[in-house]
A protein has these predicted regions:
Chain B
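Short cysteine-rich clusters marking metal-coordination/redox-active sites
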Residues: 241-245, 266
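Short metal-binding segments enriched for Cys and/or His
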Residues: 267-283
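A boundary/linker detector
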Residues: 162, 181, 185-216
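General detector of N-terminal leader/presequence modules that precede the first folded domain
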Residues: 1-182
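Short Cys/His-rich "knuckle" micro-motifs
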Residues: 248-254, 274-277
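Short linker/helix segments within small regulatory modules
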Residues: 253-263
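Short Cys/His-rich Zn2+-coordinating modules
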Residues: 217-231, 249-251
């Protein structure tokens, strides 16, 4: 009898876990992937998991990728669930990305600029041809040629524009930014909170939204002022010391998108910025984030705000892939109680409708 | 009492529990009002009971006995999974008997056995906002609750009656709590709604993904929305349970073959089992 | 010379859980008196129930106002880590050993966010069930009787004003020795 099949949930779960472990390992005749290999050779997957898992730890992120069989949303979820149990010791000082040790830095708005353009490790000008040489186990590639480090500082492009008064000034605030991992979002959400949500948000969702602003759903005229990738120092001020000490480095990708702004009654026409910052090397995400950040400022800048990317609630409530995947996937949990109610209700409604038709 | 090493009793850290406990007390003080809380990522996915789990984790102690049901049954996989989670992280005894439990965490049902004082019913809630299909903007629904402006819902129900002759909501049927707040009872069948009214047990609702907690204190009026000429009517299959013969309990319809054969069984497995055992006892005597 | 700091909960996890369940039961069934177990020995003038309630609910996120004096403040700061505020209106939790601040001076929440209202813990001299005030409202089947000794004379007048502001309004926890009872903002209190 069908009824018996739903019994024994406990045993079914145990068996499913065992099967999952077997599938994860794959063919035991092949050597097992180490966490270090994932960390080193699937580094962009690790970066994405750190960004969306909102926890900077390459080793844990690599473990999550391995445990999740390469499912990056599942891996981000594992990392989040771990992160949430950690005690909160304090907050860091704001990162100074101006002092970044830059490995890549490009601007689309200036041909050359102080500090120069640094292409760095990028897919951008590769030809997307499958490299069958990689399929064979080979020697490591020869070391990349190193150019002498530029001594010149690398001022931010937005700073250069600001000097000329062309870039809207960002209000400076010493206020402690909100923390959406501790307080639920409330609307209207201020920009620090929005940026926090976007930085944790799903790359694919933000990519689609950013793209929509380029296609007329939101009036965007973006230029990449600058993208930079590199290491920045993390500093904290322990209360017992009273001054900042460095506790380590983070790899981050920052994108500053320059956008037109027509001006308002109180503000002259000028450029405004959209901002993106993500853990690790996550250029696509940083760019998409900066487009969406700018779109979300539409209302405060007095622009029309009708497009999906310009709606705070729409974007912020739906960009978190751990929330989204949970709720979408919960549809596979049993719903037969509700479905039974719907069945009975539908039978009742149809009976009423047919009776009326017959009369 | 053995618990998983490396984690606090009942998984959550004490700071998180305190934050949730403060939210629960305010929820009880304002019956039916949704209190936002700093919901944490749980080791189970959002939508799978994270709100209920956080509420249970914040109230449970070693003196408790926990029952977990999904669709009325103790043996559905998600109920098993959540019960195992608490057995592992809190080491509390669990039970399948409604009458023996001090805390019952549920998804989609209220047990058939009437609950009593001293028991707490914890609902897993996917969408805490009863108005969300009519007004998706949270900032706006917050305003409507502040003004107790529930015209949108009344219009919706009225339109149902105009079109179908009945209110077409069969589960998650909206209720008014203590005459003030419109509340989503979670996706329980409308059949269960009357059990919420003046229930002797405390009812707590946790929505993890939506980050809301709300409550109905004991003996509090919970009224299913209706109209004088179209009173609320809970729906139940017109059949008896094939196992225990109950004509009062809520039934699952089980398809037995591909020729239209079907049977009906109690959705509440504990209730059904108790009734079958009673019949066997009577027969043995 | 300062006294050595009195200890907090011996078992912070389980004692907080025990005290919270008493608070939850008290708030859910207004007028029912809960009795706390445990060996908490807070500094004077704190009584056991009030001290346990504060350790259970207060932390760095809850500004606390109290008139309990320096020893109690030092104890709270150390064991609960809560900020102490001078303005009753700025507090999320208040503990009054003497005359309580008047309810209109306290945070009562807003129509949209009534849950932001403060919780007022009042130390009283005695709490007894089955006699005294007649309480009714959510959490109460018909009526609960509660006798409270040691409240200011105008408490019921202030309470009626507080209740009339629903959904705004403060919630009160009454503590006497190791006993506690609660008055959520919904409860109707009648004399005799």
């Amino acid at each position: 009898m069908a009824y018996v099949a739903v019994k024994g949930g406990e045993r079914a779960i145990e068996h499913a876990h065992a099967w999952l472990a077997e599938e994860r390992r794959g063919d035991p005749a092949l050597p097992e992937l180490t966490v270090a290999q994932v960390e080193q050779q699937m580094s962009l997957a690790v970066d994405r998991v750190m960004a969306e898992g909102a926890c900077f730890d390459r080793g844990l992120a690599a473990l999550a990728v391995k445990q999740a069989r390469g499912d990056l949303i599942e891996a981000a979820f594992l990392l989040r669930a771990y992160r949430t149990t950690l005690p909160r010791f304090g907050a860091s000082m704001p990162l100074d990305t101006g002092a970044m040790r830059v490995r890549r830095r490009i601007s689309a708005t200036y041909k050359d600029l102080p500090g120069g353009q640094v292409l760095g490790p990028t897919f951008d000008y590769t030809h997307r041809l499958l490299d069958f040489a990689l399929a064979a186990e080979g020697e490591p590639p020869p070391p990349a040629p190193e150019s002498p480090a530029e001594a010149a500082a690398m001022p931010r492009v937005t700073g250069i524009l600001a000097q000329e008064g062309l870039m809207a000034a960002e209000p400076h605030s010493e206020a402690e930014p909100g923390d959406l991992t501790r307080e639920p979002l409330a609307f209207p959400a201020d920009r620090p909170l929005r940026l926090q949500a976007l930085a944790r948000g799903d790359e694919g969702f933000l990519l689609g939204l950013g793209y929509s602003t380029q296609r007329g759903y939101g009036n965007a005229h973006p230029f990449v002022g600058e993208i930079r990738l590199g290491e920045v120092a993390v500093e904290i001020v322990p209360p017992e010391l009273g001054f900042a000490i460095e506790i380590g480095d983070l790899t981050v990708t920052e994108c500053q998108m320059v956008n037109q702004f027509a001006g308002s009654r109180t503000e002259p026409p000028q450029f405004t910025r959209g901002y993106g910052l993500v853990f690790g090397h996550g250029e696509r995400k940083a760019m998409a984030m900066s487009l969406v950040d700018r779109a979300l400022r539409a209302a405060e800048l007095g622009e029309d705000a009708e497009a999906p990317a310009q709606s705070q609630e729409f974007v912020l409530y739906h960009c978190d892939n751990v929330e989204a995947t949970g709720f979408v996937e919960h549809l596979k949990l049993p719903h037969y109680v509700d479905f039974q109610s719907e069945l009975e209700k539908l039978r009742q409604l149809r009976a009423t409708a047919m009776q009326e038709a017959a009369e | 009492m053995s618990t998983a090493t490396g984690y606090n009793f009942a998984y959550l850290d004490e700071d998180t529990k305190r934050m949730i406990r403060r939210a629960i007390l305010k929820a009880v003080a304002i019956p039916g009002h949704q209190v936002p809380f700093g919901s944490r990522e749980m080791p189970l996915p959002y939508g799978w009971g994270t709100g209920g789990i956080q509420v249970t984790a914040s109230i449970i102690g070693p003196q408790d006995r926990l029952k977990v049901i999904d669709q009325g049954a103790d043996d559905t996989t998600n109920a098993v999974s959540i019960r195992r989670f608490f057995a592992r992280v809190a080491g509390v005894p669990t039970t399948e008997r409604t009458s023996e439990a001090s805390i019952i965490q549920t998804r989609h049902r209220i047990p058939e056995t009437p609950l009593r004082e001293g028991q707490i019913l914890v609902y897993q809630v996917p969408m805490p906002e009863p108005l969300f299909r009519l007004e998706p903007r949270v900032a706006e629904t917050k305003r409507l609750h502040a003004m107790a402006d529930y015209g949108l819902m009344h219009v919706r129900l009225y339109e149902d009656i105009a079109r179908h002759g009945h209110i077409a909501i069969s589960y998650n049927y909206p209720v008014m709590v203590n005459g003030r707040y419109l509340m989503a009872p979670s996706p329980i069948p409308a059949f269960d709604n009357p059990k919420m009214d003046r229930m002797p047990a405390l009812q707590l609702f946790g929505a993890g993904r939506e980050k809301r907690i709300y409550a109905v204190p004991p003996y509090t009026a919970v009224r299913s929305l209706d109209f004088e000429d179209h009173p609320f009517e809970p729906v139940r299959a017109k059949a008896a349970c094939a196992l225990c013969g109950s004509r009062e309990s809520y039934l699952d319809e089980v398809v037995t073959d591909d020729r239209g054969g079907r049977m009906f069984l109690c959705s509440d497995t504990d209730y059904c089992g108790e009734r079958q055992a009673a019949v066997q006892r009577d027969a043995a005597e | 010379m300062t006294q050595p700091l009195a200890a907090g909960f011996a078992d912070p996890v389980l004692e907080a859980q025990h005290c919270f369940r008493a608070l939850l039961e008290a708030m859910s069934r207004p007028g029912r008196v809960q009795r706390l177990a445990g060996a908490l020995a807070p500094p004077a003038p704190l009584n056991l129930a009030a001290a346990a309630a504060l350790l259970t609910l207060a932390d760095a996120d809850t500004p606390v106002w109290t008139d309990a004096g320096a020893d109690a403040e030092a104890w709270l700061r150390f064991h609960a880590g809560c900020p102490l505020v001078a303005e009753p209106g700025a507090a999320a939790l208040l503990l009054a050993c003497g005359a309580p601040p008047s309810p209109p001076a306290l945070e009562a929440g807003t129509e949209e966010e009534p849950h932001r209202a403060a919780t007022l813990i009042l130390q009283v001299t005695a709490l007894e069930e089955g006699t005294g005030w007649r309480l009714s409202g959510p959490g109460i089947e018909v009526a609960h009787r509660l006798r409270v000794a040691g409240l200011p004379a105008d408490f019921l007048v202030a309470w009626a004003t507080n209740r009339a502001r629903f959904p705004c309004g403060v919630d009160v926890v009454l503590c006497a020795g190791e006993r506690l009872a609660a008055l959520p903002r919904t409860v109707l209190i009648e004399e005799g």
